[in-house]
Amino acid sequence: MNFSCLGLSKICFLVSVIFCTFLLLFIPKTKTPWRPRTYPQPRPPPLFNATCGKQFALPGIEHAQQKLPTHTTDITHFEDPGNVEDWRAYILGRENPDEKHEGPTDNPGEHKSVLASSINSSKDALEFEDLFIAVKTTRKYHKTRLDLLLQTWISRAKQQTFIFTDGEDQDLRQRAGIQVINTNCSAMHTRQALCCKMAVEYDKFIESERKWFCHVDDDNYVNLFSLRHLLASFSHSQDVYLGRPSLDHPIEAIERVKSDGSASVRFWFATGGAGFCISRGLALKMSPWASMGNFITTAELVRLPDDCTIGYIIEGLLGVKMHHTPLFHSHLENLQRLPLQSVLKQVTLSYGGPDNKRNVVSVGGIFSLENDPTRFRTVHCLLYPDTHWCPPRKTR
């Protein structure tokens, strides 16, 4: 009896070993072999065989690379008085910007425009608290250019405006408080210093969790009503890049493709001197090339100034087209040609330099040109007549 039980146990053991061996040999053949997954990676910034400066002759870029005087009390710019552009050259909705039109285009749908987006059905319920307005300045202009902005439009948008500068200023800190951000970037007006400030602007906007990022310079007047009206025509969750180019054609540059050739890349960029706006949805997509110091790295790889690098990331890398709008204005334009009846409808305004002080918007009736050389105070009083320093309106 014991012998038969022992034999049966051995037989069961042998059967189980054979069965396990069979499973080990058969199962791997029925399974799909494992392959490592490949996940989409951000496209690395390629090297450009070009710059926005000399090769493409952007108005004002060569000037921007120059060092500014170390001491000045002049509120205006150092610019070539002949280097202005006609604001009427920018027509909404045209595919070929080399063709200048005086009226509506025949095919406005081919190129993205503010006009097309103004009928967007997915509009934002936009409040002023949703805006992040970054003002780029330098310590040298705190008591001139920036002081003028603090007296005028910034006084109406204290919680929406953040001042990015390059030096600590206790007087400015007392006036604007935590809205002043010392970037610790160089005070030189160079490509590296400008990109350093833009990198800080981008990171601070991402931290803020606000819906819209708008960048302006310290020589821009921002019409807050027009700005909100414009941005409310779009959805902040979509890819929106709003601005005005300083050229009438996109930049065309050579992009190196490994070692077996090259390809041409073309993109528009919105000039920072007129201001531009970016939706939060698009800003988040820029993160691989713009966040945590990556913006400086990207700018160095392509050797482009700050506003050109923004356009390169958005159009050149992400493939998002810029919405061209004539509502933004820089000191490079002939501002006197802006019709009087439309001045108060613009989003940003600017003014000319010391050699071209007459390049200002044509508004009057409140302050003389001597007392208001930039015309910003006059514009502000027309928009906000209740401002305490504005003269009372004359009653007929």
UniProtKB/Swiss-Prot annotation:
This is Beta-1,3-N-acetylglucosaminyltransferase radical fringe. Substrate binds at residues 145, 218. InterPro entries: Fringe-like_glycosylTrfase (IPR003378). The keyword Glycoprotein applies. PANTHER family: FRINGE-RELATED. Gene3D superfamilies: 3.90.550.50. Glycosyltransferase that initiates the elongation of O-linked fucose residues attached to EGF-like repeats in the extracellular domain of Notch molecules. Involved in forelimb development and in adult forelimb regeneration. Detected in the mesanchymal region of the developing limb. Expressed in mesoderm but not in ectoderm with no evident boundary of expression. Glycans are attached at residues 49, 120, 184. Belongs to the glycosyltransferase 31 family. One of its GO terms (molecular function) is O-fucosylpeptide 3-beta-N-acetylglucosaminyltransferase activity. GO terms for cellular component: Golgi membrane. Keywords: Developmental protein, Disulfide bond, Glycoprotein, Glycosyltransferase, Golgi apparatus, Manganese, Membrane, Metal-binding, Signal-anchor, Transferase, Transmembrane, Transmembrane helix. Its main location: Golgi. It holds the Pfam family Fringe. Has some activity with cobalt but not with magnesium, calcium and zinc. Its cofactor is Mn(2+). Residues 28-396 are lumenal. It is a single-pass type II membrane protein. The keyword Glycosyltransferase applies. It is found in: Golgi apparatus membrane. Mn(2+) binds at residues 219, 331. The active site is at residue 307. Disulfide bonds join 185-196, 214-277, 381-390. Residues 1-6 are cytoplasmic. Its EC number is 2.4.1.222.
